């Protein structure tokens, strides 16, 4: 994530959040025109690969089955692997309309700067427990998948299991301006 922008691939989750004014940024940068990042093979899946292309693609059967169970067929035709792996965390308290969020006390994720409490686990005041909601990551982790990240500091590769954080606000290890390539 960048401070002033979000990367968008399929947009099925990000754009819905923007509609609710959740974590909006001044700019959205599409990855759709970058050539070759929609590849699907048995060894490599690009970040722009549509989930629908994984259902019947040349991938491990567990990946195909998991992709086929995500949402509806219409969403799978737009949703991408990169978007699914980089979903924002979800919280019953935070992922509501702007008016609803204003009607309750702030939480860690709302970033009001007051040292607020987590609404899910009150009185612990140290950690946001909003959870990751993606469908494909668990299967890829079981298979020992790695992710390739690229950004201003160059490229890096890590196990997908090392990509996520145990914090609802800092959901993954992406640095400013970096994105998941494959």
Show the residue positions of the predicted features.
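C-terminal structural segment of proteins
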Residues: 1-182
């Amino acid at each position: 994530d960048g401070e002033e922008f979000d990367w968008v691939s399929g947009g099925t989750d990000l754009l819905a959040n923007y509609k609710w004014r959740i974590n909006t940024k001044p700019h959205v940068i599409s990855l759709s025109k970058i050539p070759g990042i929609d590849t699907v093979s048995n060894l490599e899946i690009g970040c722009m690969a549509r989930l629908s292309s994984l259902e019947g693609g040349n991938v491990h059967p567990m990946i195909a089955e998991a992709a086929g169970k995500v949402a509806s067929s219409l969403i799978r035709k737009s949703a991408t692997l990169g978007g699914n792996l980089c979903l924002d965390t979800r919280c019953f308290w935070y992922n509501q309309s702007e008016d609803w969020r204003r009607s309750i006390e702030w939480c860690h994720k709302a970033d009001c700067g007051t040292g607020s409490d987590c609404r899910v686990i009150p009185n612990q005041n140290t950690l946001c427990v909003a959870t990751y909601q993606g469908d494909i990551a668990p299967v890829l982790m079981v298979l020992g998948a790695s992710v390739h990240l690229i950004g201003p500091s160059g490229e890096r590769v890590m196990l997908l299991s090392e990509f996520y954080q145990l914090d609802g606000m800092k959901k993954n290890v992406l640095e400013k301006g970096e994105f998941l390539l494959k």
